[in-house]
Amino acid sequence: MSGVENPLFGAEQLQRELAGAKPPLLLDVRWQLVAKRPEDAAHPVGYGDFLEAHLPGAVFIDLAQDLAGHGEPVDGRHPLPTPEDFAASVARWGLAEGQEAVVYDDQGGMSAARAWWLLKLFGAHDVALLDGGMAKWVAENRPTESGISSFAKSRAPWR
């Protein structure tokens, strides 16, 4: 994936990369304006879907907390996070500087594109969008897992 020109990463290619020696970090950015189920109201929107099924080893990204700033109402619903806040989120996800990442969602790429754009804006080079997102991955009967993925958090500050 080094030197990505095309931001889209195919499911078949990703499945091969996941079996390799240096798999990319998978970032699940599924998000909706409102929770789908009443029991999801206590968690970030999209987290319930993540717990039910996600790509193997994926990390859940909360659009409202990780990909947005928290300013005044006049700043809009999802203003940009500060570089410091974004770096803290990236480190919490376990993404090390120089590591490859693939971002996906289930809403046509809107949330994933925001994560991709912010990662690129703040200096990530090898980041891609999963072509077709979670829906295509599942439709092709590719492996998923449930629950919380275990991953190594980044030890060094990111950017």
Say what each PLM segment does:
Residues M1-R159:
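Cytosolic catalytic domains that perform sulfur/thiol-centered chemistry
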